[in-house]
Amino acid sequence: MIQQESRLRVADNTGAREILCIRVLGGSGRRYAGIGDIIVGTVKDALPGAGVKRGDVVKAVVVRTTKERRRPDGSYIRFDENAAVLIRDGGDPRGTRIFGPVGRELRDKKFMKIISLAPEVL
């Protein structure tokens, strides 16, 4: 579960290393975001000379969470870290590579470009 003030690792090659969640999109009272949900965040750590810099406000989709998530077949999925991929307004990823596994829930949310770039879908 990602909420305001949560810090997430960035799992792409945009140059950002870490973002801070400042809003969970999807309604005025929405508090938590899970795998496949879109958040608005600010870049807290970035590589020098990258496409994004510290302080930029960006949209991102959550691809890994440490909080377990129950799937329709009764199994649970959980990861070792909270991670997100930066996206454009249209939903396409800003980077050209994705690092680490991503959740299968992204397929249900129609993030096919992220699914195709990911090395592993769990």
UniProtKB/Swiss-Prot annotation:
GO MF annotation, one: large ribosomal subunit rRNA binding
One of the GO biological process terms: translation
Pfam families, alphabetized: Ribosomal_L14 (PF00238)
InterPro entries noted in UniProt: Ribosomal_uL14 (IPR000218), Ribosomal_uL14_bac-type (IPR005745), Ribosomal_uL14_CS (IPR019972), Ribosomal_uL14_sf (IPR036853)
Keywords attached to this entry: Ribonucleoprotein, Ribosomal protein, RNA-binding, rRNA-binding
Family annotation (Gene3D superfamilies): Ribosomal protein L14
GO CC terms: cytosolic large ribosomal subunit
CDD domains: Ribosomal_uL14
Binding partners and assembly: Part of the 50S ribosomal subunit. Forms a cluster with proteins L3 and L19. In the 70S ribosome, L14 and L19 interact and together make contacts with the 16S rRNA in bridges B5 and B8.
Function: Binds to 23S rRNA. Forms part of two intersubunit bridges in the 70S ribosome.
Family: Belongs to the universal ribosomal protein uL14 family.
PANTHER family, per database record: 50S/60S RIBOSOMAL PROTEIN L14/L23, LARGE RIBOSOMAL SUBUNIT PROTEIN UL14M
Stated name of the protein: Large ribosomal subunit protein uL14
Gene: rplN
